[in-house]
Each structure stands twice: as structure tokens, then as C-alpha cells.
């Protein structure tokens, strides 16, 4: 029986469990060319989310993913709902747009050390737990208008190169 080799991506001792993509040493999520894999990436991401839902998982680990774009608007991420609550995006690169409009996050969300090449949109979101955008590079506009941060919101050491819109955002706990 031939076993497919796993992705070569490593982060703080974590080994990516996904199979290699085409002739790359990386999986579809860590493959360096976002344009080349766009359709495969979206289908694989939807399958990963569905798999985590069916397992009853409480988190989705997307550390180091190289996103062509991501659209997860109007979703509720909750351990008691259908989508896993905790989202881990550390060190990911977003080459396309990032859209989470009207989403509700019941657990931690971690975007630390991410690079955003295109606009990011988190309008009218609710973060019930800590959210981290530490040490990020945001190269385009970002919109957090009307977003509610119920716990700690950290943007420390983040570089904003475009307009950062926090109009009508509510910070109920510590913001840095």
C-alpha cells in the first residue's frame, strides 16, 4: 500500500497533517502559488471545515496557510453550533481579499504574524473571546466598522499601510 507523503510545513513543533499537493512538497493550503491552486484551495478549505464540523472539533488549525482569498461571512463559529469555534491563522498569508462580514466568533481567533496583501473586511462582527492581530502586516485597507470586541483585542506591533476603519467599533475589554 502506497502512502502519500504529508506536507513539509512546520510551525512551533506542529507538523501539517495534509497530503502534498501535486508535485509540491507542500499541501494545497501551504503551497506557495495562490493563483495556481485557487479552485482546489477553496474546495479543500470547504472540505476541511465540513470535516471538522462532522468530527465535532472545537477548532480549525489554519496556521501558515497561503490563502488566495477567504469569504466566511454570516457564519457563527461556536463550540455549540455547527462550525468549530476557535480559529488559528498564525503566520498565514492572505493574497486575496479576506471577508468575514456579520460573523460571530464565540472563542479565540488568532491572526498573529499574518500578512494581508488585499483588503480585509470584518464589518459588523462579534468577537466574544480574545482576538489577536499581533505583529501583522496589513498592506491594504481594513474595515472593522461596527464590530464588537467583548474580550481582549490585540493589534500590537501591527503595521497598517492602508486606511484602518474602526468607526463605531466597540471595545469592551482591553485593546492594544
Q: What are the functions of these language-model segments?
A:
Residues 1-176:
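N-terminal leader/targeting and pre-domain segments
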